[in-house]
Structures are given as structure tokens and as C-alpha cells.
Amino acid sequence: MSFIILLLLLVFVGVTRLFQWRKTSSFIKLLLISLFILIGSGLIPRYLLNDLQANYERKPDIQWTSHNAIILLGAGTQLIASTQEFEPTFFSFGRINETASQYKNCAKAQTICKVIVSGGDAQNNGVTEAEVYQQQLLRLGVPLADIIQESNSVNTWKNAQLTSDLMKHHQFDNIVLVSSGLHIRRSELYFNHFGLNVVPVRADYMAAQISWLPLWYNFAVTDFALHEQLGFARYNLYNFMGWNSKREKPGDA
């Protein structure tokens, strides 16, 4: 996404030169160079990432109650060519490990603990994220009897909507939401929209790399951060236009 913005600015430079709009051309060139340096050096992605993750930097001390649910949000699947088997993506393993860790902490409290794996077949691979992630959870010691699959959602909004529908059939008084640090703020917003009071727990923390020379890594993490910011913008726009599902009061789900 950042490269698309820079490419568009480069096209505008060409257009302004064609029409000999020298002042406009100079301004756009300055903007183009400035953005390239600020993104590549890590200054812009550092700001964007801090804005998304700062409130979730410290993981909460969960107070386990009698009926607990730990929600694991999917982040895609990957086909391994040599085995023709599907595994969680690179970005998923942190979420899975954090979920298993939270489950073990919950189990130590000798209370009811369920893991809800939310993720359908968004990539049309013929297998759902919930199925694939469940296998990893089993390997990490989470009992099959304590895993509930929500296998129809294809994005974060549907994760929240369909999981809240599922919750109406259970009596959980404590809900822990696990996702990536970059993604947890928007996830919490969506789950709150559907009436779920959740305790957000980040599985990882993404940071920019400050450098005197532009790094491709910083452009990549900028794109991740911009994707989240666009999600907030879309949510606010849809609310304004009345296109989102009706917001539920916390605890209604």
C-alpha cells in the first residue's frame, strides 16, 4: 500500500512535468522523497505501530472465574508443497502459542476453560483455519473436549459477529481475546460492537527498525499498520452510513 502511494506520487510528478506545473511538480517531488525517507528510516511505521499497540504492551493478569472462554483469531493457512498439508501461517503461531499458554494458566485455576478457534476458509483452500489451528492446539496440550470451532468467518468483522452468536449458547463470565499486537485493537473494537466484553491479550509485538538507510522491512510493517487504520476508517464510515450491524450493549451477547 505504501508503494502504491509512492507510485501514484511519482505518476503525479510525471503529469505535472508534462503540463509544466513546476511549483506543483516540485512540491510533489519533495513529498515523495520525504515519505520515502520517513517510511524507510522507520519513523512513520514506528508512530503507526505505537498508536496501534501501546495500550496493549503490558499483558494483563487474567482473573480466572468459574466459566472462561479464550478466543483465538485466525490469520490464514499455508499449504506445504512437499507434504500437501496445511499449517498455520507465519503470523499465526504466536497467537496459537499464547492461546495455549492462557489455557494452561486457566486450567491451573481448576475452572471451566474453553478455547474458541475462530476462522473459516477465507483463502478457499478447502480447509478452515479452525481445523488447522485445532491440530496445533492439541499438540500443545489443549484437550479436544475444551476446543470449540467457529469455522465460518472470513474476516475480523465476521470473527466477532459469529463468535458473539456462538456465545449466546454458552454462559461464559470471562472472555479472553487473543490476537497479534498489531491486530488486537481493531479486534477488541469489533467484539465490543457485538456486545462482548473481552480481555484483550496480544500474542506478539511488532516494531519498526530505525535506520539511517531505508529498509524494505519498514515499508512492509507500514503496510500492515495502514491496513489496520483503513479498518478503523471503514468501521467509522459504515457506522455513519448505517451499514454496520446494530451495535449491541456490552454483555448482550
What kind of region is each of these model predictions?
Residues 1-18, 226:
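Membrane-embedded alpha-helical segments of integral membrane proteins
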Residues 3-6, 26-30:
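Sec-dependent signal peptide recognition
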Residues 4-5, 40-44:
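N-terminal nucleotide/polyanion-binding subdomain common to many enzyme families
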Residues 17-28:
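Membrane-interface helix-boundary motifs at transmembrane edges
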Residues 21-22, 51-56, 240-245:
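Membrane-interface elements of multi-pass transporters and channels
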Residues 27-42:
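Hydrophobic membrane-insertion alpha-helices, especially the h-region
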Residues 42-219:
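A structural signal for short, hydrophobic/glycine-enriched beta-strand patches
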Residues 205, 218, 222-253:
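Extracytoplasmic/luminal low-complexity segments enriched in Pro/Gly and acidic/polar residues
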